[in-house]
Amino acid sequence: MAQMYFYYSAMNAGKSTTLLQSSFNYQERGMNPAIFTAAIDDRYGVGKVSSRIGLHAEAHLFNKETNVFDAIKELHEAEKLHCVLIDECQFLTKEQVYQLTEVVDKLNIPALCYGLRTDFLGELFEGSKYLLSWADKLVELKTICHCGRKANMVIRTDEHGVAIADGDQVAIGGNELYVSVCRRHYKEALGK
């Protein structure tokens, strides 16, 4: 029986690395995984999942208009899929997360989703909210704050490295824009 997994964390915990390792494990056993990533994130090239340690793989793209069930079903009909791996899953819509439950329940294909739990304001992303609600298994990937405690928050910084507390929920960037911190240092950085 297939299940839907949500691997979540703050930034720099190795979500993409873990996804790529999972894909490799399936391939090593002669199985066919399909990788999807958000079209909005093209930092490392269009249609690619890349990790900070240098691993990368080609990926199918999704945006807010993508019918995830139909896209996966089409791939599955062309060549049997053994799992679906979704990077940057926080950018999924509620409807797309529901479509993933249909992939799991109707097509019997496991869905392994990797993404951020919350944004720089501490608010859930839409995709993360529904993955937390509907996933069969929740797995927290851990990273650390500069103080050594578990980092479970993300701060967005300006060009001078100062934490900012307003702006659009989505701003694509890496270490130059975001810092993973513990809750205490998150509150201190934002003056809360």
Curated annotation (Swiss-Prot):
Amino-acid positions noted as binding ATP in the UniProt annotation, renumbered to this chain: 9-16, 87-90
UniProt-listed GO biological process terms: DNA biosynthetic process; thymidine metabolic process
Active-site residues per Swiss-Prot or TrEMBL entry: 88 (proton acceptor)
InterPro entries referenced in this protein's UniProt entry, alphabetically: P-loop_NTPase, Thymidine_kinase, Thymidine_kinase_CS
GO cellular component labels: cytosol
PROSITE patterns named among the record's database cross-references: TK_CELLULAR_TYPE
Binding site for Zn(2+): 145, 147, 182, 185
Annotated GO MF terms: ATP binding; thymidine kinase activity; zinc ion binding
Main location: cytoplasm
Entry-linked Pfam families: TK
Compartments where located: Cytoplasm
Keywords per UniProt: ATP-binding, Cytoplasm, DNA synthesis, Kinase, Metal-binding, Nucleotide-binding, Transferase, Zinc
Catalytic reaction annotation: thymidine + ATP = dTMP + ADP + H(+)
EC number(s) from the headed UniProt entry: 2.7.1.21
Known partners and oligomeric status: Homotetramer.
Database matches in NCBIfam families: PRK04296.1-5 (NF003300)
Protein family (similarity comment): Belongs to the thymidine kinase family.
Protein name as annotated: Thymidine kinase
Source organism of this protein record: Aliivibrio fischeri (strain ATCC 700601 / ES114) (Vibrio fischeri)
Gene: tdk
